[in-house]
Amino acid sequence: VTDSQWGFQYSTYVYYNEHCIVFNGVHTPMKIERATFVKLFDFVKLFPHYFLGSNADLPIVGGSILSHDHFQGGHYTFAMAKAPIEQKFEMEGFEDVEAGIVKWPMSVLRTRSKNPDRLIDLGEKVLRAWRSYTDEDAFIYAETDGEPHNTITPIARKKDGMYELDLTLRNNITTVSYTHLRAHETSAHL
């Protein structure tokens, strides 16, 4: 993966078929960036029957070990991967990429192309736009007091000869009204 050393192991939790964890061989903090999309597709090219995804890189919405770069995947098709496109759209400069909003309870964009490099480029564009997006009426803030709140949970797969990249838009703002959404004091999990 990206011409570097990575570890591969099957999870002891076995949440689904061939549930695997892929670890960076170098201790590197987890971060969602362009290189993340490159790594996901490098893996999917090697194992086209697997999906590979990353948890979000922010506390609360990440629910993961943020201190070490890793991914999870497997030989499984989740319900979200089967969910239909609710609304198709086109992005300027990416007219060759199929894109749409997934009919799902979270905000998920699905992009499809025979060329994974186009999905990497588009994924980076969406990530940059979402990281800086604020909508006060919807209580979405890109940051407060210098703390970032917007990130993406990406999932890559190959399906019917096409590469897909699902981008779940995440925001980790919590309020006193929704204390049940706060992370445990001793854990990054909900």
Where are these regions (language model features)?
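Low-complexity, highly charged intrinsically disordered N-terminal segments
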Residues: 1-3
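Residues forming anionic-ligand binding surfaces in small-molecule and nucleic-acid pockets
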Residues: 11-26, 105
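Histidine-centered divalent-metal-coordination microenvironment in nucleic-acid enzymes
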Residues: 18-19, 24, 61-78, 168
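Helical scaffold of the NTase/Pol beta-like nucleotidyltransferase catalytic core
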Residues: 27-52
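Catalytic or ion-translocation cores adjacent to nucleophile or general acid/base/metal-coordination motifs
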Residues: 48-64, 73-127, 131-134
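A short glycine-rich, hydrophobically flanked beta-strand micro-motif that places a catalytic Asp/Glu
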Residues: 50-63, 139-154
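C-terminal functional module detector
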Residues: 129-132, 136, 147-160, 168-173
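Conserved small/polar residues in nucleotide/adenosyl-binding loops
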Residues: 179-186
